[in-house]
Amino acid sequence: MTLFTRRNLVTGAALAAPLIANPSLVSAQVSEALVGSASDAERIAMDAYIYGYSLITTEVTRVQMSNVPALGGLHGPMGQFINVKRYPPADYRGVSAPNADTLYSAAWLDLGAEPTVFSHPDMGDRYFLFPMYSLWMPVVECPGARTTGGRAASFLITGPGWSGQVPSGMREIKSPTRYLLILGRTYANGTDADFAAVNALQEQYKLVPLSSFGKPFTFHAPPVDPNPGFSMTDKPQSVILSMSAEDYFNRLARLMGTAAPPAPEDGPMLARMARIGIAPGQPFEAAKLDLTVREALRDLPQRALAVIGAGRSSLGNEVNGWTVTKGLGRYGINYMKRGVVAAFGWPANLEEDAVYPNTTVDSEGRVLNGANKYTLTFAAGQTPPSTASGPSPCTRSTKAGGLYPIASTSSQSACAMT
């Protein structure tokens, strides 16, 4: 039997809970003689890569968006809203499959030192939502017209382990990770007058540290890290592909041990990963793996992305040639679906707020071509619902996930309804 590591970690359900509650216990459970096949280790490495893909993607995106000294374009310091004043242009790639009916308001929060109070004004009957994403990418909460209504409100957003007094009249939103993304959307009908009205609302979206709530507060941007360790301009997927498997797993282990504790239901996966030396807060040492396994790790990023790409069918069901998404925003232990969304649709709304039926072929199975004209047909009385104060039910996107330009002659395109 081939040695795949010189360390033996107690595995199974008995290890899972201690790993989550106190990752430092891993080092206390190391002995010297676990053996197993190299193929076992390679499968674990593949599963671990997919498991961590949403976390690494979100962390890379966080740094690229927020490691800046001031607001500019689609970037802004931690703790400050980036308010987009008009519909996104056709070349916008900040999120996958954006819509052209709402104006975006995005902010990254650091909840490590203290909670943040998020406030919005009275929104009337205007459609809006503020989905909040953990570093692992699931939606933590989604204040908005559908869930909390249009009245002015304040929310206390707290990080892992916080315990304290929640101010009267506030609802606590508990983030499972130190960093959290708010990706707000506010409906606008496209006229200059309505853009101005929404822009005025955006100026009233406030983020204040709990210690400063109700007091005069002046925002100060946190210091910029001059060496984030990867490109600030390449697409996250390209950044991740450029990482070696050892670098990737070390980043994953560091994040799990600090900013992004694994979920309780991740226990069995943590126990498997520990068998090849991947554990929260512990260094991953590829040199301690068998040579065959180390060789397999060399092209793991490319192979794993191919596996994730092949897993797109996990996003939903096929109906009349369309893949109709199901269960986005809540992933549980479906790490493949979470990885697919991270790679090709980051970060995705809850299905109560958006469904993403998509196709790249016409009714006869031919690949969509931007040079052609197509008709999208709904049965009588079965068009997607919409209201005067809410967004259009249908947005077209290119295959790459951007908005579909009206004059596009792209050789391939995709349709999506959001």
Q: What kind of region is each of these model predictions?
A:
Residues 29-418:
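A compositional/structural signature for long, glycine/proline-rich flexible linkers
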